Amino acid sequence: MSKKKLVSILLSAVLCFGMLGSTFSASAAYVSVHLTKNQAVNSSSNVYGTFKYFWGTNSKSSKHSVYYIARYKHNGVWYTGGSTLLAAGREIDEAHAIKTERLDYETDWFLKLNPKGAGTKDCDAWGYMKNA
C-alpha cells in the first residue's frame, strides 16, 4: 500500500471518529443529585440548554416527601422551570420524566431536591436531569 493511500485512510478514520465523538458528547449532557439523610437540600451541577427532562426516586426510608425542582438562570436570576413532589417510596422513571418549560434561549439548569417543610432532613432521594 502506498504511503499516500495509508495517510488518506488514517485521516478519513480520524475525521469519522472525531465527528462521531462530538455527536455523542453534545447529546450526553446529564447530571444527578443525591439527597442524603443529613441534608436539608441538595442540588446537581449545571447543565446547559433550552429545556430539560428530570426524574428520580424518593426512598421508602425517607421520613418526608421531597420536592424535585428544575431551576434555570435568566439575567443572573434563578427561576423554577418545573417541579413535582414525590412521597416517600415513590419514583418517576426516565421513561415518564417530567419536561421543563421550553425557553427561547440556552442557559444553565440544575435540579434541586428539597424535603417538604422548612429545614427538614432525614430523606434519602436521587434525582436526574438530562438534555432532550
Residue ranges and their predicted role:
Residues M1-S27:
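Sec-dependent N-terminal signal peptides of Gram-positive bacterial secreted proteins and lipoproteins
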